[in-house]
Regions:
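Active-site-proximal N-terminal segment of extracellular/periplasmic enzymes that hydrolyze or transfer
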Residues: 27-73, 140
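Active-site His/acidic residue clusters
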Residues: 45, 307-360, 410-419, 609-612, ...
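Short, structured active-site-proximal loop/turn typified by the sulfatase FGly-forming signature C/S-X-P-X-R
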Residues: 53-88, 133-135, 158-167
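Formylglycine-dependent
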Residues: 103-104, 110-121, 129, 141-317, ...
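Histidine-centered active-site microenvironments of extracellular/periplasmic hydrolases
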Residues: 147-159, 332-335, 377-446, 454-455
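C-terminal cap/loop subdomain of S1 sulfatases and analogous C-terminal strand-loop tails that border
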Residues: 159-162, 166-174, 184-189, 409-415, ...
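A long, amphipathic alpha-helix that forms part
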Residues: 301-312, 344-399, 660
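Alpha-helical segments with a strong preference for the paired helices of cellulosomal dockerin domains
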Residues: 662-683, 691-719
Length: 721
């Protein structure tokens, strides 16, 4: 391992990317580089023009991201997990979901076994050994606060010195009542009137604002008024008149207030109601101290502001890693402030239609791109030219910038030639391919693209490589890492492929026993996708734009699964999301194994991903290209099928189940008994039977397996017992 470390140190020093701890190179020590890690939520490879060159794709304008790519290396075959939590846990631990238990987006009902374990060696814990200070700003979604002993303090427990942002999986739902002022049944029965949580259009009107004493006051800007979005962006709530329309005069706003009072409604808007990206719960954790407040700042702007403030506070301190985990473009789709957009005057008519959502998706990315440019300038890494363009010269900095999407794009805004029916939440190419860009001092031949396979778990090793840390030494040997190197691609433009395969998987998380999940159908451009693993409530299904079929859902209500929805013949064509799936691919072929609903198709799928200029230019795994249904495989395909199947089975078998081991050391001993006692009566990672409570049953599981060493191979372990 010393040889590996010296080699890694040499690479780091040659690139100017950091310092090493090996004694033979200490006299050459340089300040370790800072790491700025930018995560775009639900931005797949189809969204950025640097990765999707299809003439059919109307991609957003992203000059800031394009500038980073022009000064760095783009990775065109970067593979994530199909959903956010599994991807995020993978890149912060370097471990596949079947090892961490986080195989699906964490929902409020998921038990601790489906959340990141406090015993994982996360990258902030590893970097701390080299003196790094770590912060995360923005979306968290690794575990908690529900059903987690650490609650809102989870980021601190997982190693981050500072956290500020939205700890949940996405922004809150849109407030279609405009602060409780509008009720569709009372005012015209139009539930879509404020589908974006704000009056749209150029109309200027009255804005409710809170004074320092939190008393609502009407603000008309001396007669100039505000557009609905301007009011919302300022932290206010647009005032409605007596007809439930945007009030264009102070008299109209006063009449609306009086009319609501006569109807038994509150005459003033409710400033406690959350509203998508504009009004949300901000959680801050610093040195284990929790603070929470209701933020009324557009989320992407707030995330950038907090990031710049934190970076500036590190001046003169040691090396740092900042994860800027933007919440865009997670649903709900909502128009950003106009001053963040390059297309003045172009506005979506609503936030529910397919065309409108595609426009909103582009605008949310464009707004985020502008804020990424402001982030680089605020961090001292770039300057704004007179023409507004970004001038970024990473060679003069000591900061490596890594930008990724966390998984594929969500259904409504997928761009051609990628497949919306096989997007986020599925194991198919559109669901697991995302952009990745790395820029920093010493990158060889910037502006190039690497086509070789890179996995999301490899980021863990890249973070270590930048800091001069061998993560395989830093993590306990009994905890298997799946990471492989990335740094050689940055140093050497002619680097041979490092990975031969990438592995992806998705499951249903871990809900309390006996819990049922209502089926939800997501419809888009004639495609209908049914899932009974993603949305734990009918309201969550509705908030995502779906149709629920639970006890109070769409008629016929009470359907007990997607097969029942299919049997009801409600849709001409219904795709059912598998209950769980894994996939493995090499440079050309891809094998998928599904746990399907009883009414669905065969468990195995096999694809040739070689791109064809006309029928499959992106090399996708579309239904018509599935090989096993086309007859016997040819010799080359059969050989690859066998190799991929054997590799996947060996990989899955490498993680040995260890009942009674709660602290991830592959031993069942006194520390596990202590864990049961410390968490007795509540949920925890020591709840081995996943019934939602740590109790006598879990103690008995530890006692039954006491002193078992799960690292010993099966037959030998059986002999020992």
């Amino acid at each position: 391992m010393k040889t590996y470390l010296r080699t890694a140190c040499l690479l780091v020093l040659l690139m100017g990317l950091g310092a090493c701890s090996d004694s033979s190179t200490q006299h050459q020590r340089q300040p370790p580089p800072n790491i700025l890690f930018i995560v775009l939520d639900d931005v797949g490879i189809d969204q950025l023009n640097g990765f999707n060159s299809s003439p059919l794709a109307v991609t957003p304008q992203t000059p800031s991201i394009d500038t980073i790519a022009g000064n760095g290396v783009s990775f065109a075959s970067f593979y994530t997990m199909p959903e956010c939590s599994p991807s995020r846990v993978s890149f912060f631990t370097g471990r596949y979901p079947f090892r961490t238990g986080v195989n699906a987006a964490i929902l409020p009902d998921d038990l601790p076994s489906a959340q990141i374990s406090p015993f994982e060696e996360t990258i902030p814990k590893v970097l701390a050994t080299r003196g790094y200070t770590s912060a995360m700003i923005g979306k968290y979604h690794l575990g908690g606060p529900e059903l987690n002993p650490d609650g809102y303090l989870a980021p601190s427990v997982m190693g981050w010195d500072y956290y500020a942002g939205n700890i949940y999986g996405g922004p809150p739902p849109l407030d279609t009542t405009i602060g409780g002022q509008y009720d569709a049944d009372t005012f015209g029965g139009d539930p879509e009137r404020f589908s974006c949580g704000v009056p749209l259009g150029p109309t200027r009107g009255v804005c409710w604002r809170e004074d320092p004493g939190q008393t609502p006051q009407m603000d008309y800007q001396h007669g100039a008024g505000y557009t609905g979005k301007e009011c919302l962006a300022l932290g206010g709530i647009p005032a409605l008149d007596a007809d439930g329309q945007f009030a264009t005069t102070l008299e109209g706003a006063a009449a609306g207030s009086a009319a609501r009072e006569l109807l038994g409604m509150d005459p003033y808007p409710d400033f406690s109601i959350m509203n998508g990206f504009y009004v949300w719960l901000r959680t801050q954790v610093a040195q284990g101290v929790l603070q929470q407040s209701l933020s009324r700042e557009y989320m992407t702007v707030a995330e950038t502001d907090a990031s710049i403030d934190w970076i500036r506070a590190q001046t003169g301190q040691g090396p740092w890693m900042l994860t800027v985990s933007y919440s865009a473009t997670h649903v709900p789709f909502q128009p950003p402030p106009d001053n963040l957009l390059p297309h003045a005057g172009i506005e979506a008519p609503n936030c529910t239609g397919g065309l409108a959502q595609r426009l909103l998706g582009n605008q949310m990315i464009e707004a985020m791109d502008k804020e990424i440019g402001r982030l680089l300038v605020g961090a001292g890494l770039a300057v704004q030219a007179d023409d507004g363009s970004l001038e970024y010269t990473p060679e003069g900095s000591n900061t490596v910038v890594i930008l990724i999407g966390d998984n594929g794009t969500f259904i409504p805004i997928v761009k051609p030639p990628y497949n919306p029916t096989r997007s986020k939440g599925t194991i198919y190419e559109t669901g697991v391919r995302a952009p990745m860009i790395v820029a920093g001092p010493g990158v060889a031949e910037p502006g190039r693209t690497v086509d070789d396979l890179v996995s999301v778990v490899d980021l863990f090793q890249l973070f270590g490589e930048i800091a001069g840390i061998d993560v395989h030494d830093a993590v306990p040997s009994r905890r298997t890492l799946d990471s492989q190197p990335v740094l050689p691609y940055l140093r050497n433009a002619d680097q041979d492929p490092i990975r031969s395969t990438v592995f992806m998987e998705i499951g249903g998380g871990q809900k309390p026993s006996g819990m049922t999940i209502p089926p939800c159908v997501l419809s888009f451009s004639g495609a209908n996708i049914c899932t009974d693993i993603l949305f734990v409530s009918e309201q969550m299904c509705r908030d995502t734009g779906g149709t629920p079929f639970g006890p109070e859902g769409a008629p016929p209500a009470g359907l007990d699964g997607c097969c029942a929805v299919r049997d009801a013949a409600l849709y001409d064509d219904l795709t059912i999301v598998p209950l769980s799936a894994w996939a493995i691919r090499n440079a050309r072929y891809k094998l998928i194994s599904n746990e399907r609903a009883p009414c669905d198709g065969p468990p195995l799928e096999f694809y040739d991903l070689q791109a064809t200029s006309l029928t499959n230019p992106a090399g996708l795994d579309n239904p018509e290209d599935e090989l096993l249904q086309q007859g016997p495989l040819n010799a080359d395909a059969q050989e690859n099928y066998t190799q991929l199947y054997d590799t996947a089975r060996a990989l899955l078998a490498s993680e040995v189940d260890c009942p009674g081991d709660g602290n991830l050391d592959k031993r069942v001993d006194q520390r596990d008994l202590d864990g049961v006692e410390a968490n007795f009566g509540g949920p925890s990672v020591f709840d081995f039977n996943n019934d939602g409570v740590t109790d006598e049953l879990d103690r008995s599981i530890v006692e039954h397996h006491f002193l078992r060493d799960c690292s010993v191979p099966g037959p030998l372990q059986a002999a020992r017992e």
